[in-house]
Amino acid sequence: SPDDPAYQAFYRGAQTERDRAYHQGTVWPWLLGLYADAVAAVEGPDAAKEEMMPVLAALSAHLRTEGCIGQIGEVFDGDAPHRPGGAPAQAWSVSEVLRVAKMASP
């Protein structure tokens, strides 16, 4: 949480700084699938689709134009502009984003 004193908004710097940010501020794209499942279970599939669309649009643009084209990075900064970090191509990030996109499609 950004309110936690240990929160690290950006994944950068020396190894020790990146290690702190790894579990104290970065966004892990593969968790989007679990979050979408939870929203669908609690609020219903339509609510999950509505909530996922802006996130899917941003990740789709990243997939097509940034970093390793056709891939999604391992982590993203917790604060805007949410730059990718870690491994430039993470299979489980791509697979969960594609699964959520399929869930959100009409």
Please provide the spans of the model-predicted regions.
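Conserved structured core elements
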Residues: G25-W30, D46-K49, M53, A91
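Hydrophobic, well-ordered secondary-structure elements that form the walls
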Residues: Y35, V39, V97
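Alpha-helical packing segments of well-folded alpha/beta enzyme cores
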Residues: L31-L34, V55, L59
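Structural helix-adjacent loops and short alpha-helical linkers that scaffold large soluble proteins
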Residues: V39-P54, K102-P106
